[in-house]
Amino acid sequence: MATNYIFVTGGVVSSLGKGIAAASLAAILEARGLNVTIMKLDPYINVDPGTMSPTQHGEVFVTQDGAETDLDLGHYERFIRTKMTKRNNFTTGKIYSEVLRKERRGDYLGATIQVIPHITNEIKDRVIAGAQGHDVVIVEVGGTVGDIESLPFLEALRQLAVQVGREHTLFMHLTLVPYIPTAGEVKTKPTQHSVKELLSIGIQPDVLICRSDRMIPPNERAKIALFCNVAERAVISLKDVNSIYQIPALLKSQGLDDFVCERFRLTCPEADLTEWEQVLYKQANPVGEVTIGMVGKYTELPDAYKSVNEALKHAGLTNRLSVNIKYIDSQDVETKGVEVLKGIDGILVPGGFGYRGVEGKIRTAQYARENKIPYLGICLGMQIALIEYARNVAGLTKANSSEFDKDCEQPVVALITEWQDAEGNTEVRTDESDLGGTMRLGAQQCHLVSGSRARELYGKETIEERHRHRYEVNNTLLPQIEKAGLKVTGLSADKKLVEIIEVPNHPWFVACQFHPEFTSTPRDGHPLFAGFVKAAYENHKKSVK
């Protein structure tokens, strides 16, 4: 079967939810038995999001093969079974750096390097490479039509549609259809102008996804179809909903998947959305609720912890619980004290970088340990739990990480200089290495200790989880901390690096060096998050007695 391409663009305003719409359509097509993948093309000039501020860009999602990518790839993996790779996300910066590398190497034989054809050809080559082996590839272009940054991507996709044939390509455009209260009606003019902008660069959309706070009336959909030269059945109303996991059913109810299959002449069974119906049923019918305190430094933008937020919700689904997340700035713990932690059922300290707010996180871990509050530490959340235990239990009063104090006397966490990657190759880093692309990244094996809580939760001896960090537990000082009672219950493939720690004589205190949130999905959940939320609910029931 020839690969079919769906190109997704957005107009009028940004943040319309192109990624969610693309992932939802992919979920329906996957439910029809098709092999689907999704790509995200980002117009910014950074090579990848790895060094971008989480408060500007949101979280960095790490793929199985170690790519630092846009958070939309997290949405893709949560909606479909296909795992994303380095091929599924690239930026203007990555395209330009590759073209310039080829130019320096002499690949272009002295030609003048131009946006057309060299940049557009590189974009097309990467899209085609990422589509290999799939029935349908959905390609989302970041930004808004009309932005200067996205023009090379749109031109490349226009050319690609001509090359592979319009019978194998479909353009899907998301627009805003605002409701004007004073007029008492929705307005279609912004959509018409957005389509006009798209037409000016040679692209005629085949499907319009119209975002609004309500369903768009049939007469307005007919009007949009007429003036935008689109089939009326291809004008899809996408209203605001309580849960993003309602979107697949909403799109299917309007026949979007049927339209796509007919366009590509695909014969496949009806979509079976039973799993998504079960997700929505659990979400709508919780048997209880818990409040989780998330203590971090990027709390002003919840998207900085997008996958963690979603993983907590998935754990709620697994346990039939409604999970309320209370965001707590770790600096508030430093300035206001542990009073800000009162009234929560469980504490989660996620990953992060830099010294700001670290002492607040350490006090948070101490509060959770001493007050028997369920605690889940992720990446930095594990490291600060180790520092706290070393200082207050193991007698290493000057314990710290060399990330925060390069001259600390007792660096229980230190810069990792050498480790093995998933293929068994040795990676080496130093203090002088660049910030971008120099971390321990991607899926790594972890051995779980028999009899541990982690082993009980996962139900197997060996697991694979994703990493994104530079610093590791210092094995030189580890014996003294273990002697004081701390349990190391997860080790790397070569059994040299600490992956999971547990505090004994505590209802639930588990911390891991990896990022379990990247592999949690609404249909399957994740054992660590499920166990944590269950423990938090047990704690909640005690507190209300």
UniProtKB/Swiss-Prot annotation:
GO terms for cellular component: cytosol. It holds the Pfam family GATase. Residues 1-266 are annotated as: Amidoligase domain. Gene3D superfamilies: 3.40.50.880, P-loop containing nucleotide triphosphate hydrolases (3.40.50.300). Residues 291-542 form the Glutamine amidotransferase type-1 domain. CTPSs have evolved a hybrid strategy for distinguishing between UTP and CTP. The overlapping regions of the product feedback inhibitory and substrate sites recognize a common feature in both compounds, the triphosphate moiety. To differentiate isosteric substrate and product pyrimidine rings, an additional pocket far from the expected kinase/ligase catalytic site, specifically recognizes the cytosine and ribose portions of the product inhibitor. This is CTP synthase. It comes from Haemophilus influenzae (strain ATCC 51907 / DSM 11121 / KW20 / Rd). The gene is pyrG.
